[in-house]
């Protein structure tokens, strides 16, 4: 049985009766103090904070873990990162956030250099305008074009090439 809780924009609240992951890398009974939609502190049943007047939510024994990081995926819910649209990135980021992923670095395929530059530009523009309700776009996982044809997997061999510092610079410039 899986339970999901959605923390809406709130000034301060306590989520009690959850299983928290502690600094000593153990799961234990406790709770979470949330302030301005961010985790302010985590407590165990031995050190329950006294915060009268704050909103209290009963987690009903659910596990509460840090947000997950998705570093290698190409898309979801019918959207692909290589669709090269801010709408696709937004849909992907919102979906990822809805399943506990707070940080994303979606992957490209090995495409022509010009297409990759466009995708990187779109991602950079999205990052500047990013909707705070979706997972945070922190980078792009580029699967080429500088890969070995021997280990190409599903990548299009026509777009594979030796590393080229000028093209690397073009990718960096497009990402700004």
What are these regions (language model features)?
Residues 74, 90-119, 135-148, 175-176:
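Divalent metal-dependent hydrolysis catalytic cores, especially in the metallo-beta-lactamase
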Residues 121-176:
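Metal-coordinating catalytic core of metallo-dependent amide/deamination hydrolases
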Residues 11-13, 20-65:
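Histidine-rich, glycine-flanked metal-binding segment
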């Amino acid at each position: 049985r899986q339970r999901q809780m959605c923390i809406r924009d709130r000034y301060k609240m306590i989520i009690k009766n959850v299983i928290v992951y502690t600094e000593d890398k153990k799961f234990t009974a406790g709770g979470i103090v949330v302030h301005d939609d961010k985790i302010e502190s985590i407590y165990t049943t031995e050190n329950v904070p006294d915060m009268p007047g704050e909103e209290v939510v009963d987690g009903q024994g659910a596990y509460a873990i840090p947000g997950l990081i998705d570093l290698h995926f190409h898309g979801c819910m019918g959207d692909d990162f290589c669709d090269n649209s801010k709408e696709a990135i937004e849909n992907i980021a919102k979906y990822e956030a809805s399943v506990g992923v707070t940080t994303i670095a979606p992957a490209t395929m090995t495409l022509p250099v010009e297409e990759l530059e466009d995708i990187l530009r779109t991602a950079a523009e999205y990052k500047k305008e990013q909707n705070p309700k979706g997972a945070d776009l922190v980078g792009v996982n580029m699967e080429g074009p500088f890969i070995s044809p021997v280990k190409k997997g599903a990548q299009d061999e026509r777009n594979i090439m030796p590393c080229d510092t000028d093209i690397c610079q073009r990718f960096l410039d497009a990402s700004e």
